[in-house]
Amino acid sequence: MEERTGEVPGMPELSQETERRGAVLPLGLAEVTGPSMVPTLYHGDRLVVQYGARVRPGDVVVLRHPFQQDLLVVKRAAERREGGWWVLGDNAYAGGDSTDYGTVPEELILGKVWFRYRPRPAGRRSPLAVARWVLSAARPVLSDRSASRRLRAR
């Protein structure tokens, strides 16, 4: 049976290639759709996800949406609360995080994002454009320990 993904406006949907193999191979690939993690992640970014990884506050995680569990989303784990994780998008204006659906149970957190790859934009072939892309295309996704400070400011 094939995993299907739905669309929720403003929600970064992930189309994953290896979620089912996560139990055998702890690394998988995913693709971001949606604006809620801008400026950290953009629509079209490819992610390397470690399934079953230990999550700490500030980590970017892949999770099942609490109300639509066939939809995978990517958010930042802001803090652990009673009943699971409080997750937030890096783009405060996009919504679609724990401010909408509350605490996410631990069993819905699938893995931690370690690395992102940004595909080369079509039509940009000048040497300067290619050089800029080469320098920024692949980056580690770092934990942001200041997410808890952002949480207190809300």
Regions found by a protein language model. Give the residues of each.
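Extended hydrophobic leader/signal-anchor segments used for secretion and membrane insertion
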Residues: 1-154
